[in-house]
């Protein structure tokens, strides 16, 4: 997973609340067995509307999604996070996330920053008045800068650390390879063990 420190990208105002994971990526797009290639399914039900925000310049090149409250609720599909990332989003800001979505985001490398609703509305206003406005998200300081406005966001310390270090679950496990090997070496012979792959 790529480490995240600071990201600057075009802000996208998604003025919708209660966006569940089925709206983020409908179930019909979940047939792949890989983690990539889901960008076409992102908001598929809405992208048929020519006036949908991601169909408009310059928002179709956005990388910071500023969403309404209750973003990512519903089923626990990781594909919702993968679709956002495949499209190009690095950050999603909302005043409230579905808990499972927020956890999946952090594990995959997508920043899900909690921002007060009044600050979300300020960001919407600034972006809509200045299409193409770039937002800078600083994970170290937990701030979002839009022009001269600076707003704070919340993210738990553990997820923040993982993102700053670029550690997904596999990366965390690989940090413990020596300890795992020492544990396996000390296991009694009569206990089950994982066999080395044969050549």
From Swiss-Prot:
GO biological process terms held by the UniProt record: L-leucine biosynthetic process
InterPro entries assigned: 3-IsopropMal_deHydase_ssu, Aconitase/3IPM_dehydase_swvl, AconitaseA/IPMdHydase_ssu_swvl, IPMI_Swivel, LeuD
SS bonds (residue pairs): none
UniProt pathway: Amino-acid biosynthesis; L-leucine biosynthesis; L-leucine from 3-methyl-2-oxobutanoate: step 2/4
Keywords: Amino-acid biosynthesis, Branched-chain amino acid biosynthesis, Leucine biosynthesis, Lyase
GO cellular component, one term: 3-isopropylmalate dehydratase complex
Similarity comment text for this entry: Belongs to the LeuD family. LeuD type 1 subfamily.
Name of the featured protein: 3-isopropylmalate dehydratase small subunit
Organism taxonomic ancestry: Bacteria, Bacillati, Actinomycetota, Actinomycetes, Mycobacteriales
């Amino acid at each position: 997973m790529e480490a995240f420190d600071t990201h600057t990208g075009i802000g996208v105002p998604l003025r919708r609340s209660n966006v569940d994971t089925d709206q983020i990526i409908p179930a019909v797009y979940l047939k792949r067995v890989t983690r990539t290639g889901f960008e076409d399914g992102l908001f598929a039900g809405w992208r048929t509307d020519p006036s949908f925000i991601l169909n408009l310049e310059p928002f179709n090149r956005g990388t910071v999604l500023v969403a309404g409250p209750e973003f990512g609720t519903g089923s626990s599909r990781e594909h919702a996070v993968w679709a956002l990332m495949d499209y190009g989003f690095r950050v999603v800001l909302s005043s409230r996330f579905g808990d499972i979505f927020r956890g999946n985001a952090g594990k995959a490398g997508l920043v899900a920053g909690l921002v007060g609703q009044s600050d979300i509305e300020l960001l919407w206003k600034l972006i809509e008045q200045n299409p193409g406005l770039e937002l800078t998200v600083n994970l170290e300081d937990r701030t979002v800068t839009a022009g001269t406005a600076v707003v704070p966001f919340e993210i738990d310390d553990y997820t923040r650390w993982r993102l700053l270090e670029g550690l997904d679950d596999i990366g965390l496990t690989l940090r413990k390879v020596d300890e795992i090997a020492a544990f396996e070496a000390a296991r009694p012979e009569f206990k089950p063990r994982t066999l080395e792959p044969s050549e």
